[in-house]
Amino acid sequence: MSLLVQLDQKIAANGGLIVSCQPVPDSPLDKPEIVAAMALAAEQAGAVAIRIEGVANLQATRAVVSVPIIGIVKRDLEDSPVRITAYIEDVDALAQAGADIIAIDGTDRPRPVPVETLLARIHHHGLLAMTDCSTPEDGLACQKLGAEIIGTTLSGYTTPETPEEPDLALVKTLSDAGCRVIAEGRYNTPAQAADAMRHGAWAVTVGSAITRLEHICQWYNTAMKKAVL
């Protein structure tokens, strides 16, 4: 049974929650053993997959979870705005560390390695390819190039201003076009995640609202300060 079929079955049975375990950089939680513990807790709570950044974090997580892992490597490049899995060596390292799915930046922006080259390398390892996209054009282009999964991860993050709400319209557009869509980006409440499923999402990735303690505390502090000022 293929991994996609297995995921289809898990999503049908459990609702399609993917948890992104990416602590704030340099946070007290930013340690491989803590990332792995968060991932295991998410799996035990019903997550159908885990999204992990970094090879060391992925290795630690692979040792304790059985659900599929979406692996990425983030880099800040001097000559490109692309940050997510930009190099062949990143793909190779993630594959060796135990990723089941490798996600790359799928936007139409200057990059060191073409999208199609990275997709071919992912498939060379026998893994599923996910592209993190920002527009319908990005997603449809990546689907034509052979990406099995299209994420809305970068919607709102390639423009000067980032909206507060998730991009449900992009989810619906890509789903209607036949893409397997993982809704990702600003899904900070269960209601928003449910809306994404109603708009055709195959699954929904939630990160900050579950695994970034600093962000959650900031949301509460901001709301409570407004209430008393």
Swiss-Prot record:
Enzyme Commission designation: 5.1.3.9
GO CC annotation terms, alphabetical: cytosol
Swiss-Prot/TrEMBL catalytic activity: an N-acyl-D-glucosamine 6-phosphate = an N-acyl-D-mannosamine 6-phosphate
Pfam families: NanE
Molecular function terms from GO: N-acylglucosamine-6-phosphate 2-epimerase activity
UniProt entry keywords in alphabetical sequence: Carbohydrate metabolism, Isomerase
Pathway(s): Amino-sugar metabolism; N-acetylneuraminate degradation; D-fructose 6-phosphate from N-acetylneuraminate: step 3/5
EC top class, as a word: isomerase
Keyword Kinase attached: no
Any one GO BP annotation for this protein: carbohydrate metabolic process
Isomerase listed as a keyword: yes
Function as written in the Swiss-Prot or TrEMBL entry: Converts N-acetylmannosamine-6-phosphate (ManNAc-6-P) to N-acetylglucosamine-6-phosphate (GlcNAc-6-P).
UniProt cross-references to PANTHER family, sorted A to Z: N-ACETYLMANNOSAMINE-6-PHOSPHATE 2-EPIMERASE-RELATED
Family assignment from sequence similarity: Belongs to the NanE family.
Protein name as annotated: Putative N-acetylmannosamine-6-phosphate 2-epimerase
Organism per entry: Escherichia coli O7:K1 (strain IAI39 / ExPEC)
